[in-house]
A protein has these predicted regions:
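Catalytic-core signature of thiol
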Residues: 1-239
Length: 239
């Protein structure tokens, strides 16, 4: 994934509001987060990160939990700069979703391979009207975004110790704030025994980590770049 400074973003730079955000939050408890998914042998993490933050915002606005289609983004958002199973960016997906409605997982199911776009406008459910971006590496800003708005799409530098993670608060000595190579979803944050952490939803199935999740050390100098390429869309019903 490219550096944030290399991206020509059409998003709105997020500015933390003055209103206080909670010291801890877990959006799973409010129904903003769907079940853990599995991207399989396809480099589509960016699509899962996109649908994850879309699902949270749709729940926030419509009070309805819907699992959205990653496969539609894999198959259809290439002209907006994405590369299917070869990688992509959440912000490119938002640009696509400004023009096309996002279908549900059930109407456009995941296949873990890039195929021909089979988008059906009649089945579109949600669209993007704009999106916030946070490229500063400022974890306080990300806390404000997640704490006040909901689950946010983020990117991190994944090294072998991340892949081998089983449980506990992950603290890496090897990952970089710059080498972003994997997109995930920040669904909350908290503190345990004096150690601040992010609650992060991955797309590697339930058998990885803490039933598909990882708690990543927070306020450790933007560890693994979690606050270097964050975003959150404004979502409305389609059309």
């Amino acid at each position: 994934m490219p550096r944030a400074s290399d991206i020509l973003s059409h998003g709105i730079p997020y500015e933390a509001s003055n209103r206080a955000v909670p010291n801890k939050i877990d959006w799973r408890e409010s129904g903003y987060v769907t079940g853990v998914k599995d991207q399989g042998n396809c480099g589509s993490c960016w699509a899962f990160s996109t649908t994850g933050t879309m699902e949270g915002q749709y729940m926030k606005n419509e009070r309805t939990s819907i699992s959205f289609s990653e496969q539609q983004l894999v198959d259809c958002s290439g002209p907006w700069g994405n590369n299917g199973c070869g990688g992509g960016l959440m912000e490119n997906a938002y640009e696509y979703l400004k023009q096309f409605g996002l279908e549900t997982e059930s109407s456009y199911p995941y296949r873990a391979v890039e195929g021909q776009c089979r988008y059906n406008r009649q089945l579109g459910v949600a669209k993007v009207t704009g999106y916030y971006t946070l490229h500063s590496g400022n974890e306080a800003g990300l806390k404000s975004l997640v704490g006040s708005e909901g689950p946010a799409a983020v990117a991190v530098d994944v090294e072998s110790d991340f892949m081998m993670y089983r449980s506990g608060i992950y603290q890496s000595q090897t990952c970089s704030p710059l080498g972003l190579n994997h997109a995930v979803l920040a669904v909350g944050y908290g503190t345990q025994d004096g150690t601040d952490y992010w609650i992060v939803k991955n797309s590697w199935g339930l058998s990885w980590g803490e039933r598909g999740y990882i708690r990543m050390a927070r306020n450790r100098g933007n560890m693994c770049g979690i606050a270097s390429l964050a975003s959150l869309p404004m979502v409305a019903r389609f059309p």
